[in-house]
From Swiss-Prot:
The keyword Zinc-finger applies. This is Small t antigen. A zinc finger (H1C3-type) spans 131-153. The lineage of its organism: Viruses, Monodnaviria, Shotokuvirae, Cossaviricota, Papovaviricetes. GO terms for cellular component: host cell cytoplasm; host cell nucleus.
Length: 195
């Protein structure tokens, strides 16, 4: 996500969101901060019109560029539908509802051990499969979070693995707009129908 905004714009967005630099790319936390700051900066609530306009502009650019970064890799072709930018409020967790964590990782031991050869259709395994396909297609490593949302790229971006890495990763993916993941949501819902 380093390529999404210029360094100055990135720092300005984080400053307006009142977030530390290490949270750059954590979409869920950035979105929460955006909502909080929007309430504080809104002109009707006594905030600054200029700051609100700047925040909206930077936030809109950030979201659009992350989406473009992901889709300009060619995508995997799995996605059944695309939402307009206004529909990006539909998070992955909203899409799968109460069963999100069950659909995120169906068989934790199997999914975590069979990194390269899993035929599982949980979100974790599908994102890993995308990683392999995208890297074969592009013939390059993932250097930027946003190109890939697999567990390994998440750990590389946010630091070394910990005991709670799977929970942190599940929460990270939960807040992502479902379109950004480029998943066939039908195969996640209905694993018996997936190829």
């Amino acid at each position: 996500m380093d390529r999404v905004l210029s360094r100055a714009d990135k720092e300005r967005l984080l400053e307006l969101l009142k977030l530390p630099r290490q949270l750059w790319g954590d979409f869920g936390r950035m979105q929460q901060a955006y909502k909080q700051q929007s309430l504080l900066l809104h002109p009707d609530k006594g905030g600054s019109h200029a700051l609100m306009q700047e925040l909206n502009s930077l936030w809109g650019t950030f979201k659009t560029e992350v989406y473009n970064l992901r889709m300009n890799l060619g995508g995997t072709g799995f996605q059944v539908r695309r939402l307009h930018a206004d529909g990006w409020n539909l998070s992955t967790k909203d899409t799968f509802g109460d069963r999100y964590y069950q659909r995120f990782c169906r068989m934790p031991l199997t999914c975590l051990v069979n990194v390269k050869y899993s035929s599982c259709s949980c979100i974790l395994c599908l994102l890993r499969k995308q990683h392999r396909e995208l890297k074969d297609k592009c013939d390059a490593r993932c250097l930027v979070l946003g190109e890939c949302f697999c567990l390994e790229c998440y750990m590389q971006w946010f630091g070394t693995p910990t005991r709670d890495v799977l929970n942190l990763y599940a929460d990270f993916i939960a807040s992502m707009p479902i379109d950004w993941l480029d998943l066939d949501v039908h195969s996640v819902y209905n694993p018996r129908l997936s190829p």
